[in-house]
Amino acid sequence: MGCLPVVKTLMSAEECYVKLNDVANSFNSKIARQLHTLRKQLSIKTHFLDVYQVFEQATKHPKKFGFTETTKGCCGSGTIEIGETCKGQTTCDDPTRFMYWDAVHPTQKMYKIIAEEAVQNIGDALLFKYQIFHALEIAELIESHNLKYLSSLIDK
């Protein structure tokens, strides 16, 4: 939150506004703990994606994500325009290099990165379950085959 271009503009900050980042981290930690508690109490399955962490990683390691601009938006000056105020403003030539479309909203590329993280988060959990299920299935087949083999030896 503290790295949003509009926040940095309003706070006259060159760097991310740490207090808002701390609030986001604290909030997300509390959600993660509460979900853990609910999973245990209600025997439910949930997945949690800390979107703040995705933004933080993209801000700290822009090249890894293919960004060249993480401090301002593609629209207008990129520091104050939000939503409707972008209409009529000039935009950057290549939005895929930008993390933000305007001073608050991510670009389509950043939304795609977030979606891919969510799919991977859920997919990893499903893959693990599949691997466990598959391993148990193989163990059952081996056990069944061994029992048949042992039975055939006894019947001789």
Task: Give the label of every model feature segment.
Residues H36-R39, G123:
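A general structural signal for alpha-helical elements within enzymatic catalytic domains
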